[in-house]
Curated annotation (Swiss-Prot):
Subunit structure: F-type ATPases have 2 components, CF(1) - the catalytic core - and CF(0) - the membrane proton channel. CF(1) has five subunits: alpha(3), beta(3), gamma(1), delta(1), epsilon(1). CF(0) has three main subunits: a, b and c.
Organism: Novosphingobium aromaticivorans (strain ATCC 700278 / DSM 12444 / CCUG 56034 / CIP 105152 / NBRC 16084 / F199)
PANTHER family (alphabetical): ATP SYNTHASE DELTA/EPSILON CHAIN, ATP SYNTHASE EPSILON CHAIN, CHLOROPLASTIC
GO MF entry, a single one: proton-transporting ATP synthase activity, rotational mechanism
Subcellular localization(s) per the UniProt record: Cell inner membrane
Gene name for this UniProt entry: atpC
Lineage per the UniProt record: Bacteria, Pseudomonadati, Pseudomonadota, Alphaproteobacteria, Sphingomonadales
Protein name stated in the entry: ATP synthase epsilon chain
Amino acid sequence: MSLHFELVTPARLVRSEEVHMVVVPGTDGEFGVLEGHAPFMSTVKDGAIKVYRSAGAAPEEIQVQGGFAEVSAKGLTVLAEHVEG
């Protein structure tokens, strides 16, 4: 089972891929998203998004600044104000 993850800035699509899990730095604390997660929206604070490509894999960290995260039946979309790298 996999989660569709998209990371977008106002300027471009940074990532669009199938992953195992993503941990997002929400303003109310970090939250993890797996496939089938209940729909919700959250604001994102400056920090690292951790992308786990498979169960048990070491995470890849992507530094982001601000934005919003939306979990829907389609997966997780993060609209970040800025992505480093």
